[in-house]
Amino acid sequence: MSSVMIKLALPCLFLLALSSALAEPAQVRLWPQGAPGARGDSDKDQPFLLVWPAPKDKANGAAFVVCPGGGYGGLAADHEGTQVARWLNGRGVSAFVLHYRLGTSGYHFPIQLLDVQRAIRHVRAGAKQYDIDPGRIGIMGFSAGGHLTSMAATMFDEKPEGMTHDEVDQVSARPDVAAPTYPVISMTEGFGHKGSRKNLLGPADTDELARHVSTELRVTEKTPPVFIFHTDEDTVVPAENPVAFYLACRRHGVPAEMHIYRPGPHGVGLFLGDPVLGSWSRHLDDWLRNQGFYKPVKRAALSGRLSVNGTPVSWGSVIFTPEDPAAPLACARVMHGNFKLDEKSGPVQGRVRLTVSYSAADVPGLETVDGTVTTQEQKPGAGAWSLEIKGGDKLNLEISR
């Protein structure tokens, strides 16, 4: 990522939004002097961001560009834009809802790639003004916006026709994480979405161009970590789309997590009213936390042993919970009393609380409903169990019952 930081000429309205956290977002055009290839000066011709700064009492420095769906023919800007921005704000994340140009307005590929790259570059270049970390900028999109998200995650090095090559365009367009949500992925397979292909490619549509924008074919080892949500009952954009993208990530060693729920039609958004389907956003929340997206931290490698009454446990787990709720958790699997975590998956350095689980069979005469014992105390009445993690620790965890 480029270290270039650029002082942007931001509209007064946006500056006011930053200082007073207005309820309504500021609208910021991606090219204040006019977008390349634009046919007019209206909002449908000039792509823009709706800026939702995180509340100052919650802001953690992370940001997301949000791409509503609509088959590249419209924008579901409320439930796949505004509602998502508010959800992100609730987690301390600044949100930038992208209104990109559409095929129904006469704009076809590579215009949409140009717009999403510029959006990421704009946010990164203005990190100081937006009070965000240029190394924690994610992208999330829904349906066709999910396809645009996947293009941003796989084609960030591509230089589409129309780049202005100004200072903003010198900044990296690579997102740090990507969350394509019930996404269109393939433009060539039978499970692709024909309407999105028609609107995206327009009269220049060829099989070669369709393969070029089929993002399951564009994944490389440089693709950022990916979180995917979809439903099995989606008949508009079948689940084969995200599965193809997930498998491509696996082949290239890209960290990826996918959740496919059985019930649910296409286009559900956050769907927080459904206690089951709406839980997908909680998984995203956990994933972002454990990616270190909410708070960059130094993690530590460690190893150790876990015993109960002097006897190594047969199996179990140790969860390390940091004091900062935005910092990632760590969980070590215990087998035959031993556990080990490398620096990539270990706990954050500093004070952590321990939650230990083990087999009830390891304590003679002890029975529980599920055969498992979970405790946050080293011994009865001792209070919460905590310790200081420095790195390279060799822990000897002894539980007394």
Name each model-derived stretch:
Residues R118-S196, A210-R211, T215:
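Primarily recognizes the serine-hydrolase "nucleophile elbow" in alpha/beta-hydrolase
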Residues I228-H230, D234:
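Short beta-strand/loop motif that positions the catalytic acidic residue
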Residues P68-G73, D232:
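Active-site glycine-rich loops that stabilize anionic/oxyanionic intermediates
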